[in-house]
């Protein structure tokens, strides 16, 4: 059985299409390992959407976030990424940039 990492449901299409290839998490949600296989589930209802493999984990501070991080998150602009990160993690400056690839897609 695989562990589950959750994403907001609105990100499902972007993940499954390969447009979103990374996620930014704080320390409390950074316990994953490179090479680990995870079920990617929706945050709202814990529905499995696909299986992913963790490719890399990079420690990054909020001020070090750049356009490459935004692009991997499927966002065109850095300011959008920083706004979203601040909404989710209002006080965290220590973050983890987790790159992944979709391995299998669950068809309903």
UniProtKB/Swiss-Prot annotation:
For molecular function, the Gene Ontology terms on record are: hydrolase activity, acting on carbon-nitrogen (but not peptide) bonds, in linear amidines; N4-acetylcytidine amidohydrolase activity
Q: Which InterPro entries match?
A: AC4CH, ASCH_domain, PUA-like_sf
Protein EC: 3.5.1.135
- The residues covered by the ASCH domain are 5-102
- Spell out the reaction equation it catalyses: N(4)-acetylcytidine + H2O = cytidine + acetate + H(+); N(4)-acetyl-2'-deoxycytidine + H2O = 2'-deoxycytidine + acetate + H(+); N(4)-acetylcytosine + H2O = cytosine + acetate + H(+)
Principal EC category? hydrolase
This molecule's function is given as: Catalyzes the hydrolysis of N(4)-acetylcytidine (ac4C).
Protein name, UniProt field: N(4)-acetylcytidine amidohydrolase
Residues of the active site: 20, 23, 73
Which of UniProt's keywords are assigned here? Hydrolase
Which spans of this chain does the record mark as coiled coil?
A: none
The answer to whether keyword Hydrolase applies is: yes
The record's family statement is: Belongs to the N(4)-acetylcytidine amidohydrolase family.
- What Pfam families does the database record attribute to this sequence? ASCH
Q: What is the native source organism of this protein?
A: Moritella marina
GO CC terms of this entry? cytosol
